[in-house]
């Protein structure tokens, strides 16, 4: 009896951080258009496992979003 060929397991490629690299955008609390891409439709900060942002850049991003919220550039809650 012939055996079926072994299948290779599905391997999901790890996304690279959008803020690392030579021409990556700079994280700035005044750039509300960039920051809104990392905030959910309810106004929460999207986790790095979804956005593929590195841990260091995720901390910078969270700090920038919180600063922008405090200054009124971003809303705390989106209804």
UniProtKB/Swiss-Prot annotation:
The keyword rRNA-binding applies. Keywords: Ribonucleoprotein, Ribosomal protein, RNA-binding, rRNA-binding. One of its GO terms (molecular function) is small ribosomal subunit rRNA binding. It holds the Pfam family Ribosomal_S18. PROSITE patterns: RIBOSOMAL_S18. The keyword Ribonucleoprotein applies. GO terms for biological process: translation. InterPro entries: Ribosomal_bS18 (IPR001648), Ribosomal_bS18_CS (IPR018275), Ribosomal_bS18_sf (IPR036870). One of its GO terms (cellular component) is cytosolic small ribosomal subunit. It comes from the Bacteria. Binds as a heterodimer with protein bS6 to the central domain of the 16S rRNA, where it helps stabilize the platform of the 30S subunit. Belongs to the bacterial ribosomal protein bS18 family. This is Small ribosomal subunit protein bS18. It comes from Bradyrhizobium sp. (strain ORS 278). The gene is rpsR.
């Amino acid at each position: 009896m012939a055996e079926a060929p072994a299948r290779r397991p599905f391997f999901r490629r790890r996304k690279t951080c959008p803020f690392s690299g030579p021409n990556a955008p700079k994280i700035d609390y005044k750039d509300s258009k960039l920051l809104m891409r990392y905030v959910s439709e309810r106004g929460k900060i999207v986790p790095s496992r979804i956005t593929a942002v590195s841990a260091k850049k995720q901390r910078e991003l969270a700090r920038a979003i919180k600063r922008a919220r405090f200054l009124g550039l971003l809303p705390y809650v989106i209804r």
